[in-house]
Amino acid sequence: MSELTTTHEWNNLPWRKLERKVFKLQKRIYQASSRGDTETVRNLQRLLINSWSAKCIAVRRVTQDNQGKKTAGVDGVKSLSPEARLKLAKQLRITGKSKPTLRVWIPKPGKDEKRPLGIPTIHDRALQALVKIALEPEWEAKFEPNSYGFRPGRSTHDAIEAVFKGVKSKEKFILDADIAKCFDKINHYVLLKKLNTFPSLSRQIKAWLKSGVMDGKELFPTQEGTPQGGVISPLLANVALHGLETLITNKFKRLSTGQNKRTAAILVRYADDFVVIHEHLSVIEQSKQLISQWLSNLGLELKESKTKIVSSKTGFDFLGFNIKQYSVSDNHSSRNTKGEILGFKTLIKPSDESIKRVYEQLRDTIDRYGTSPQVALIKKLNPIIKGWANYYSTVCSTDTYNDLDSLLYNKLQQWARRRHSKKTNGWVAIKYWHVNEGKWDFRAEEDEKRISLLKFYKTKINRHIKVQGSRSPFDGDWIYWSSRMGRSPEISKKVAKLLKEQQGKCGHCGNYFDTDSVMEIHHVDGNHKNNKTENLQL
């Protein structure tokens, strides 16, 4: 078979049909798991793992859709041709074997230290994606409602809304917890026992966990932990930590009668980051002890130096946001469910650390582009501004946006003056800035087209609507899930508008977009300069 033929064959696979087949089985697994029918779950998982449809989708996800697709493991393979993708899909099967992962060190955001990733080979990544396709719907039916990290259809914004609902009506105490080296320390035996899957799959997962890691030319054994960098690792970590919320909510239930009236304790978790919320300090202190005991069974422990108990009046940071109750006048105060004035207002804002980090990123970019054309600098800064502003567009960010715009303006003035040290400030201003709607616009021209620097303050604030309870995309309610995708703060306005116009469906295959979909904007007439809405399609 020639390479041209196999390229054509891979690119022209009936992807719409394959995705529908896979989702139908996933939906059945989710339903069987929801009703506790383990035998049906296992039979359907075997069927899915051996299906050609799932194998093709698994290969596509790790070789085409995944952002880290061009990272090599110990095999040295960074990318695959369509011919090789087809070959890999045909080879995928559960063998109970695994090659070591490759240790790659990446910087921690905003810190000088680095954290290790364990990158599997491209074959192991594809096989892990296949296993995840089968395991995820089973566990989505089991996972607790206030678990939000690395789950389809859930985000940091859902977690923050859950925290807001927990603290908005009364002063609360918060256990702000940090698990020490969570991914690196999880006990393999306890994890595999908790997974409780069929023997051949259990052996395969054990092989991945025990595969070892190559650091340089030296192989290190892995007796504990799940390697960060594996496709299946976040799911395994969620399985390991499943039950933590139930532990707290069962122990500290709502009491509506008697002398010891109290509300229920709330635990909100995003992967290994979590907070416990309650009105009584004693409940929070007991929660900490209870959680420490529970974690010890997994081989984990709380990091004392980073675990603290705080009040909602003093505020706390969680997932890059700051949550705090501010004392305000009666006119601006929140009210409880009885309509009584509380004397405070709970506000969520970007955390100081996150503000500092984005400004440093902008500042360093400007410094690096000291002698570059203005257009090049604008093109480099705009994605940073847009991404950060969109992420924080669901909370009280207006003041922060204005502050960042002011800091950025001052930094750009320094940049411009350094380039023309012998010119007057007025000359520099006219060269690089233009007045637009009464405000200075940092703007340049390229191919007779104006390119302006984005402004933080122009980002519209829209409150995020939290995902409902324990809902999952595997429940098959396409209308609900596609409408949520269109409201996500992490997608651009243009994509959101097209999603709404296309009613959540792909313009090419007609399938509904799901949470794993990579959405790309296509120009209908092939003219990439024609960006009119009617010429764009997702």
Task: Please state what every model-predicted region is.
Residues 210, 216, 298-373, 384:
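A conserved non-catalytic segment of reverse transcriptases
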Residues 511-538:
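Histidine-centered nuclease catalytic patch
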Residues 8-68, 133-149:
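Charged boundary/loop elements
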Residues 142-146, 150-154, 158-315:
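Conserved polymerase palm-domain catalytic core
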Residues 405-494:
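Extended C-terminal regions of large enzymes
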Residues 491-519:
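Short cysteine-rich loop/turn motifs with clustered Cys
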Residues 61, 89-113, 122, 126-135, ...:
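Reverse-transcriptase-like RNA-dependent polymerase core
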